């Protein structure tokens, strides 16, 4: 049995926080639920927003995605899929201040999945750190990218461990430590939990 300690992520995040305007802090948001506790270091956050108030920018993205965006420095990263069978998997990078698209990486899916209202699309949230952004899709594609969109590495978990089985797709988000990714594949087939080196 191996026990994984993912707590260093909290320390990494706190060291990278810096004061912003109006006394608020501009914090990195490294993954689903931030540092794992759904709390932001930012101060004076609005309690509500609408088209008329507390909305800095809005930007449409290609395709359809259900993941949570992640933030590192002045960049916001998100994922989506495109096509009737999610033929294209996309990673988007936008400027945090104005929403301007910095880059979009589009790759073919290793396995086509028929879209429906019951099947999740790009549901696993990515993680990001000083090294890059790491993404996982319901087709089994696991990929690391630099902050500028250069592909660092790619794996197909469906090729390595078999197809994802179930009626609703995969929704488990990545989690991370300083050097590793945690990947949970929980489905109708043999489920597994992986630790993957970020390098």
Give residue spans per PLM region.
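Noncatalytic, solvent-exposed loop/strand surfaces
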Residues: 1-199
């Amino acid at each position: 049995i191996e026990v994984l300690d993912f707590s260093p992520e909290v320390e990494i995040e706190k060291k990278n926080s810096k004061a912003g305007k109006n006394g608020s802090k501009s914090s990195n948001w490294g993954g689903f639920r931030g540092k794992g506790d759904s709390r932001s270091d930012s101060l004076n956050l609005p309690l509500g927003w609408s088209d008329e108030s507390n909305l800095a920018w809005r930007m449409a993205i290609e395709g359809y995605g259900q993941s949570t965006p992640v933030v590192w420095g002045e960049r916001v990263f998100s994922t989506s899929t495109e096509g009737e069978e999610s033929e294209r998997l996309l990673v988007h990078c936008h400027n945090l201040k104005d929403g301007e698209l910095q880059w979009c990486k589009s790759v073919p899916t290793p396995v086509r999945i028929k879209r429906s209202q019951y099947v999740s699309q790009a549901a696993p949230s990515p993680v990001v750190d000083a090294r890059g952004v790491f993404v996982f899709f319901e087709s089994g594609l696991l990929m690391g990218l630099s902050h500028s969109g250069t592909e660092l590495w790619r794996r197909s978990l469906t090729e390595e461990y078999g197809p994802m089985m179930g009626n609703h797709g995969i929704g488990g988000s990545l989690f991370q430590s300083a050097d590793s990714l945690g990947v949970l594949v929980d489905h109708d087939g043999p489920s597994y939990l992986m630790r993957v080196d970020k390098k």
